[in-house]
Amino acid sequence: MAAFRDMEEVSQGLLSLLGANRAEAQQRRLLGRHEQKVERLLETQDGAEKWLREILTTEKEVAQRLLDAKEQAHQGGVEVRQLEAELQRASEEDAHLKANLLQLTRELEELKEIEADLERQEKEVDEDTTVTIPSAVYVAQLYRRISKIEWDYECEPGMIKGIHHGPSVAQPIHLDSTQLSKKFISDYLWNLVDTEW
């Protein structure tokens, strides 16, 4: 812009110098046109500078909007990742709760089976105490009166122990069922029973 002003000053100087000359009128016309072109050029330059400032301002605004949009997109991405992580945690917790529920359901079924088994056993015990045990006690007492043998029910497995209360003396019984036959044991015990009533 300074260069154009210098050119204008030079043009003015030339006009004054050429004024004495015959071609002065022609030169003035040429210089006038030159001045008009320089003025148009300066106006165009001013307009271009104004447009350039407007373009720069617009570019800054667009750049700021773009940065804002990127920031919002980034924040949105962070929120999406957070939501995905929360969803993953919730899914894992849901799976854990379902597994616990399944385990508790199995345990409940097992407890129901145990309860049913206990009820069945209770009925059997009731039946034993009302029917089987009294009759077994009666039979055991009857055998004791007949055989006069007092059994040792706390002896080791495979051993037969007790005391036979014979007519004159009490005699201990000590038999090993793993080494003696059932027939021998039966015959031995029946031989202890007194045939006289």
UniProtKB/Swiss-Prot annotation:
Alphabetical keyword list: Cell cycle, Cell division, Centromere, Chromosome, Coiled coil, Kinetochore, Mitosis, Nucleus, Phosphoprotein
Gene3D superfamilies xrefs: Ncd80 complex, Spc24 subunit
Tree of life domain: Eukaryota
Protein name stated in the entry: Kinetochore protein Spc24
List of residues that carry Phosphoserine: 11
Subunit structure: Component of the NDC80 complex, which consists of NDC80/HEC1, CDCA1, SPBC24 and SPBC25. The NDC80 complex is formed by two subcomplexes composed of NDC80/HEC1-CDCA1 and SPBC24-SPBC25. Each subcomplex is formed by parallel interactions through the coiled-coil domains of individual subunits. Formation of a tetrameric complex is mediated by interactions between the C-terminal regions of both subunits of the NDC80/HEC1-CDCA1 subcomplex and the N-terminal regions of both subunits of the SPBC24-SPBC25 complex.
Interaction with the NDC80-CDCA1 subcomplex, as annotated region: 1-69
Region (Interaction with the C-terminus of SPBC25): 132-197
Compartments where found: Nucleus; Chromosome, Centromere, Kinetochore
GO cellular component: Ndc80 complex; nucleus
Pfam families xrefs: Spc24
